[in-house]
Structure formats: C-alpha cells, structure tokens
C-alpha cells in the first residue's frame, strides 16, 4: 500500500472526512473495478487505463483524486518515478539520469517503436485508450520534472509524512 494512488486517497480522506475510517482492501489495480462491480468493495481507486474505461463498466466517478490534489496544491500529481539507491555515487546517478532522459527523448521522437511492447503489457487493448493513457502520463515531466515537479514531489512527501503515512527522511529526494 505504498502507491501514489493509495497515499492520495488517504490524504483525501484525511482532508475531507476527518474522522472516517475506511477499510482498505489491497489488491492489484486490474482487480479493483471487478471488485466494485461484484460488490466485494463499496468503491475503488481507479488508476492506469481504468480511468478511461470505468464508465463503460457501469461505474461512476465520485472524486478525481488527481484533480483534488491539483486544486489543493496547485501542483501536478507526482506519479511514478525512477529511483536510485542513495549509496550510488552521485556522478553515476546523474549519468544514469541522463541516459534515461535520452531514452525518453528517443521514445518521444519514435512513439510507434514501443507500440508492440505497450500492447503486450496494456490492460486495455483499445487503441484510443492506449493513446489517452500515453497522452496523460507521458509528458514533459517525463523528460525533466523541473522546479514544479520537484515542488510536487516535496509537497507530496511533506503531506504524507505529516499524516503519518510514511517516515520522514533527512536526505534529499533528488540525486542530481
């Protein structure tokens, strides 16, 4: 239960329903919508491609956690990242960051080279859904998070630490 979606949900619940205690049922993301449909759960946090197809499954939106976060903080959602162990030499860490950046840039310039791989691993195979998913999650922040992205990550960690969801670290969150 260490995902961004889980932490956003908990922050939202703490902010909106201060004394409400929700029972969390951990499960892989592809099982969330079926669990709600089969009434094994009252609601679920829908992520990845599910956010584009939930209406087709008879589900309705109650709260968009991303929109809630963006309105509350005026920052983008800090989704996913590539992490490196803190004991890796900083020069090596920065070289790795540069290589990953070049790989992402190559993918931006050649979007269809990865399409077979994407289709093999996608939960939803509809081409429009795949394109919506890529369009939403693969963006300029993928290449360089910049100051606003760093602020989003720092704010996310500050809020999750303050609410007791994670332990505070004295180390910088950024290697380069």
What are these regions (language model features)?
Residues 11-14, 142, 161-162:
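Short linear sequence elements within intrinsically disordered, low-complexity coil regions
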Residues 16-24, 124-133, 167-172:
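Short, surface-exposed acidic
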Residues 159-176:
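Conserved C-terminal helix/tail region of periplasmic/extracytoplasmic solute-binding proteins
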């Amino acid at each position: 239960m260490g995902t961004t979606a889980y932490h956003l949900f908990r922050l939202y619940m703490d902010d909106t329903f201060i004394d409400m205690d929700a029972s969390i049922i951990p499960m892989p993301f592809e099982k969330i919508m079926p669990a709600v449909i089969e009434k094994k759960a009252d609601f679920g946090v829908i992520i990845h491609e599910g956010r584009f197809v939930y209406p087709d499954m008879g589900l309705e939106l109650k709260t968009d956690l991303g929109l809630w976060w963006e309105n509350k903080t005026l920052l983008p959602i800090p989704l996913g990242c590539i992490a490196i162990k803190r004991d890796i030499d900083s020069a090596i860490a920065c070289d790795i960051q540069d290589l990953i950046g070049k790989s992402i840039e190559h993918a931006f310039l050649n979007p269809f080279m990865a399409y077979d791989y994407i289709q093999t691993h996608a939960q939803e195979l509809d081409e429009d859904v795949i394109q919506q998913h890529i369009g939403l999650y693969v963006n300029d922040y993928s290449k360089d998070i910049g100051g606003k992205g760093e602020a989003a990550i720092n704010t996310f960690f500050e809020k999750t630490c303050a609410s007791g969801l994670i332990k505070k670290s004295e180390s910088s969150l950024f290697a380069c």
